Design a protein with these regions (language model features):
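Short catalytic/ligand-binding loop motif for oxyanion handling, primarily in non-cytosolic enzymes
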Residues: 33-34, 86-89, 172
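Two-metal-ion RNase H-like nuclease active-site motif
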Residues: 21-31, 164
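Conserved DEDDh/DEDDy metal-dependent 3′-5′ exonuclease domain
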Residues: 52-127
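Acidic, Mg2+-coordinating catalytic module of metal-dependent nucleases/exonucleases
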Residues: 128-181
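Short glycine/proline-enriched turns and hinge-like loops at secondary-structure junctions
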Residues: 35-38, 116
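Short conserved beta-strand segments at catalytic cores or DNA/RNA-binding microdomains
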Residues: 37-49
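Acidic active-site catalytic centers that drive phospho-/nucleotidyl reactions
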Residues: 27-29, 86, 106, 167
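N-terminal accessory regions of nucleic-acid-interacting proteins
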Residues: 1-20
Length: 181
């Protein structure tokens, strides 16, 4: 979308210089949690005003430059447990320190301050945030990836990308419900 968080253009927070903040939301999928695991999907959502978009990279598409391209123009990126998982994983696998590129807020800690503990899906249920794939979890995401890789199962890839997209875009809903600026 042209004019929507344009690459290379930094946006000020709402009310500063009359520009609308460009919010970013990041979530990854991996083959597991160990240091030997691989990135399988990187999703970045962009929300500016009424415009919403989710870009995703998977498999060999995932490079430091490609992730930087998805983050370009975003004022602040939000994650859930990203400080401990997503961002260190990206740094280890791609050599990219996202926190040096864009301001980061981990919504998990905002949830904790409101006594909302547990993983993203647990918090979503407690806050009434809906999902199209309510029974999906991280274990199933790993299985879907291997079904795609080993069997060229395009339906498995489609479901995996939809699961990641829901994670990404529900971060926006979560941020708004928490009232985090």
């Amino acid at each position: 979308m042209q004019g929507f968080c344009p690459a290379g253009e930094r946006r000020a927070p709402p009310g500063v210089d009359g520009k609308t903040k460009c919010y970013g939301y990041l979530d990854i999928e991996t083959t597991g949690c160990s240091r030997y695991s691989d990135l399988t999907v990187v999703g970045v959502g962009r929300v500016q005003g009424d415009a919403h978009r989710c870009d995703q990279l998977y498999g060999g598409q995932i490079t430091a430059d490609a992730v930087l391209g998805m983050l370009d123009g975003i004022d602040e990126v939000y994650t859930y447990n990203g400080r401990r998982f997503d961002l260190p994983f990206i740094k280890q696998r791609l050599g990219l320190d996202v926190r040096r590129q864009v301001r980061h807020t981990d919504l998990m800690y905002d949830c904790w301050r409101r006594n909302l503990k547990g993983g993203l899906k647990v918090v979503e249920v407690r806050l009434g945030i809906a999902r199209g794939l309510p029974d999906m979890n991280g274990y199933m995401a790993v299985k879907l990836w291997w079904d795609y890789v080993n069997n060229n199962d395009l339906e498995a890839l489609r479901v995996l990308l939809e699961y990641n997209r829901e994670d990404v875009m529900n971060l926006h809903v979560l941020r708004e419900k928490l009232g985090v600026a």
